[in-house]
Every structure is written in structure tokens, then in C-alpha cells.
């Protein structure tokens, strides 16, 4: 493997392009930690949409957060630009970044945008198996020259808050697609079980989500990501569909029960967090309340 990181000047500047997807942004943070471990002198910028900037704030592995504007990126003057997204816009940003080294995975489109072509994660890790998204993203850092090692948990920085007056669990009962969304009455039954254990059930969702079925419980809706980070950082438990907030919860080491539809848990399960995955062959419609409650019991979380 080439050792690009050894060739980058000291001190050097590395821009990481990570557009779109809450979960992917969270799961890119182990790669950022590995990069800083390998070269503590590097100044690292993350290029991301404004709505995701809060995910990278207060992270000691991130020095700058840039909006995805070619002029902004060129003015930042990266020595190395690594694309962890792979779409058209991210390829263009990488191409015009002005970086001497422009790196992207070999399966990305627009290979002309890159002069460092990263092979499959399985080849880098020496493991012919399905790899988790965190492993896939981290493998790019290994290929660039960081020592291959255990990949850490995702990392989100949050401002310190006093302990809550009452311990609580966060429930995320919505998702981006119907086939990834468990039924509302199931979540209500699970919330009842959680409250019987002594935890308050707090439901979260985006501004456009329909949270009316959960109105008897505390609801945090449309909150900025920074506030959601703080809420998760202070929680005792997370229960939710396979979605971005589940990865945020795992980044805080929150014991989690995650209900899966069509996605593969080998790729998308909570990374390095105490968790239980509930997935059945028939999809979300076949998941029972008993299965989710039994997963909660196995986690042994209570007030």
C-alpha cells in the first residue's frame, strides 16, 4: 500500500469530503480519529452540508468544518483531499480542491477525479466478508498509510449538561421509508415497558415527522442536531428504527435496541456499542412487541 500520509508535509492539511446522510457522517468519525492518531500534526477539515455541521462540532479530531463550496475548499488549501462520499458533487469538489493528492475508492464513479485509487475494504483489511460501514470508511485511512489497528467507536462531541432530574430513554419511531419504520402502536407498548422500569420515554423526530401517536409522552421535535446530541448524551437507553439517530446513540455508547427492516445489520448495526438488533425475515411488519421487549430485557437497563 502507498504511504501517502508519510509524504504529506508536516504540518499538513487534509480535507475529508462527507456529503449527505446522517448515519454516514457519524460513521466517518472513526476514520477521522485514526487519521489524527497517525498524524497528530495534521489540520483536518470536514466538508459537509450545513445541516450536518453540528455532528462534527466539539470533536477534537476535526479542526475546521467547511461548506461544500469549491471556492471555500480551494482557499483552505488542502494537501490531501479524501472523498468518503463518492457522488457527483463530491467528486467535483475533490477534483477542483487544488490538493496534490486526491483520494477516492476505486468503485466510485468519475475515477478521473482521483490520483489515489483506494481498493475494496476487504482487500485492505485482509478479510473476505461483509464489512461494516465504519470499517469501510476507516479502511481508506489504512490504505493512505495509517497502521491497521482496531477501529474505534464513532465520536460525537456534546456540551456538558447536568444530570437529568429523571433518567430517560430516547425513542426514534420514524424513518425515511415505510419499510424501515416499525408500527407506532408497537413503540407505544415498548414505551410503557420502559416507563415501568423507571425511565421516562422521550420521543424524537424531525420537524416534518408525524409524532401525534406519541403525544402522551414527552416529544422533542425539529430540534437542532446539537440539541439532539445533548439529549442523547444524557440518556440511559435508545430504542429506534435503523436510522441516523441510532448511530448517534451508539457514538455516545448508549445501550440500544435497533429494529431493522431491509438493511443488513452486518453493515449498519450500532458500531461498538452495547446493543441488540431486532430483525426478522418477514420485515418490519413481522416484528413483535415481545421481541423488542426481550431485547430490552437482555440489555438490563433501568433507572
Predicted regions, residues:
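Catalytic machinery of carbohydrate-active enzymes
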Residues: 1-303
